[in-house]
Amino acid sequence: MKVIFNFLLLLIFVFAELIYSQGVRPIRDNVGFCWNADEMKNFIEYLENSSDKIEFDKENLIAAISVHDDYLYAGNIYYPLFKLINAKEVIIFGVTHGTVRKEVSPFTNVLILENFDSWKGIYNDVKISPLREIIKSKLDKKYFTVNNKAHEVEHSIEALIPFLQFYNPDVKITPIMVAQMSVEKMEEISLQLSKIITDYMKANKLKLGKDIFILISNDANHYGEDFNNSPYGLDLNAHQKAIENDQRIINEYLVGIVEPERIKNLAKEILPEESNQKIIPLWCGRYPIIFGLLMLNRIVGELKIGNLEGKLIKYSDTFTEKVLPFRKSSMGLTAPFSLKHWVGFFTIGFYIK
């Protein structure tokens, strides 16, 4: 009898642990990102002293595209954006990287949601916004799937959490991964999702930008032999040509008034299935960018608050930045940098004009 009792206790303990492990989304990358509050404070202070002193306006900022690379590479690109954001809740559109497609499923034509109660943060667990469950209940079931494993394997959303929580310890998030899909499918899904979000905002008297913010996670061109992507070669001249192409795309399609036609033209530059270009830069967040901007444009239109204007905050890459000399850090690097392996990244703020 005692053996049975002990066995039942063990089952209860294991079950309780299982429930908890499903309740809090665990950290995927504990090398490239900072998960210690004191160290994050020191890192922000370091960035305050080392970053460019150019100031960007917080007023009318409603959304942004953010880098998600290692902090020791991209800290100076994260910092000038995230110090502008202190909304109560943030919708984050993340990437569905190749690791997810290999380890979980080759997702296509859907948004990927999750069931966690919260995500790990630097101070405490970051709570999930009620918006997530509203999306599940109102969005057509064919447009999304729910998969905790996919979110556990993916790193492009968690990368933004330490910066978000540093500036607002009580921030809530709605994490959404965007799978590969056509522009037509994106328009179809964003039409429904934008209405769900605007209805939620109106019902809760939330102001876009101040109370609820939209973030799109992306790293720009992944260049070099490891990515099977070196159309210009592998020398300094090739590096310059590749970053100039990134910057051209940003300036032609993301800076200034962002209208649906510009978004569709951007898709022709960065989506392989839409493009007729000979050279297509390997932006890992290409699907979240197109989807997020189509949806954001609809939200701005439905709220009748003006036009969407993009402003480049900072562009760089791992080869240019090298490694930040932030001393006594627990952080490290998850990939090398060289002319044979480098990644571009940028932050852009979207304002109401």
Label the model's feature ranges:
Residues 2-10:
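Sec-dependent signal peptide recognition
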Residues 296-353:
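Long, Lys/Arg- and hydrophobic-enriched amphipathic alpha-helices
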Residues 22-298, 303, 316-321:
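Active-site histidine-anchored catalytic micro-motif
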Residues 16-21:
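Boundary at the C-terminal end of the N-terminal hydrophobic targeting segment
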